[in-house]
Every structure is written in C-alpha cells, then in structure tokens.
Curated annotation (Swiss-Prot):
Gene3D superfamilies in UniProt: S-ribosylhomocysteinase (LuxS)
Lineage, uppermost ranks: Bacteria, Pseudomonadati, Pseudomonadota, Gammaproteobacteria, Alteromonadales
Family: Belongs to the LuxS family.
Domain of life: Bacteria
Functional note: Involved in the synthesis of autoinducer 2 (AI-2) which is secreted by bacteria and is used to communicate both the cell density and the metabolic potential of the environment. The regulation of gene expression in response to changes in cell density is called quorum sensing. Catalyzes the transformation of S-ribosylhomocysteine (RHC) to homocysteine (HC) and 4,5-dihydroxy-2,3-pentadione (DPD).
Molecular-function annotations in GO: iron ion binding; S-ribosylhomocysteine lyase activity
Protein name (Swiss-Prot/TrEMBL): S-ribosylhomocysteine lyase
Residue sites binding Fe cation per the record: 54, 58, 128
UniProt record, GO biological process: quorum sensing
Classification via InterPro entries: LuxS_sf, Metalloenz_LuxS/M16, S-ribosylhomocysteinase
Species, as recorded: Shewanella sp. (strain MR-4)
Length: 169
C-alpha cells in the first residue's frame, strides 16, 4: 500500500492549533488544489470531543466559506480527521497559511455567536447521519480554546520523517 503524505510527517512534533499545507496538486486543466491540515489539538496528547467535533463540522464548513471563499479560492470540503485532532480542508486555489489561519480564527468567533443548538445547520435526521450527537457547548469550548491559543503554522520541512525512520516503522 502506498504511504500517504499525511503519514510522512512527524506527529510528535506538530504544534497545535496550527495550519499546514498537506498537499498541492493540479487538475488536468491546471487549476490548483490545496489540502490543508487544520490541527486543533496536539496528536496523541489531546482529542476533540465526539459531540463537539461533530457540531463544529456543521458550523465550521459554512463559516470558513464565509471568510475564505473569493475570486481565487473556493472550498471544496472540510472534514474531521478520524483521529479527532483536527480537520482537513480541500480547496481550489492557493491561499497563504496566514489567510487560512485568519479565516479559522474568524470562524471560531462565529461559533461563539451561535446562541442555541437549534441554529446548527442541517441538524435533523434527513440531513445528518447522527443528528442527536451534537453539543453547541462543547463546540464553543473548542472555539474558545483556539482563540485563546491563536493559530500557528506547521511546515512540512520541519516535520518530515527521515527515510531512515520511515524504514523502521
């Protein structure tokens, strides 16, 4: 099985909260696609709550589009990581890590402005596979933690696992 890009970086050295360009690629017509690792918490040290990350999934996707989409950027998808330490965001375009970090922080401010759980988008059995597994309070706790910590940048060159280490794993 091929080694995926996300497993060639040292998770023990990742800062969080932090944004990282996980991958650059191009469509056959030349459009740039960028995948970002939006690391909310340090791998193997902390984990996002099940209900909190699910509620963030519903809120974050819309808020990030509000703050980042424009003439040169269009978000394709924002999905939670299976390890529950963050989200992957795929988009058309090449915004800077700082632009993404600023949009992320603005989105967290938006999460704090949601007053009631009933305001969570697609919170019903028709549009959500686990519509009862939500917590606005937990999502807002996560947002407060991100705002308080600020968002830094993780660079692939700083996190790259050596061929020697990869060979031993």
């Amino acid at each position: 099985m091929p080694l995926l890009d996300s497993f060639t970086v040292d998770h023990t050295r990742m800062n969080a909260p932090a944004v990282r360009v996980a991958k650059h690629m191009s469509t056959p017509k030349g459009d740039a696609i960028t995948v970002f690792d939006l690391r909310f918490c340090a791998p193997n040290k902390d984990i996002l709550s099940e209900r909190g990350i699910h509620t963030l999934e519903h809120l974050f996707a819309g808020f990030m589009r509000d703050h980042l989409n424009g003439s040169d950027v269009e978000i394709i998808d924002i999905s939670p990581m299976g390890c529950r330490t963050g989200f992957y965001m795929s988009l058309i375009g090449e915004p800077s890590e700082r632009q993404v970090a600023d949009a992320w922080l603005a989105s967290m401010e938006d999460v704090l402005k949601v007053v009631e759980q009933s305001e969570i988008p697609e919170l019903n059995e028709y549009q959500c596979g686990t519509y009862q597994m939500h917590s606005l309070e937990q999502a807002q706790d996560i947002a407060r933690n991100i705002i308080a910590a600020g968002v830094s940048v993780n660079r692939n060159d700083d996190l790259k696992l050596s061929d020697e280490i990869l060979g031993k794993l």
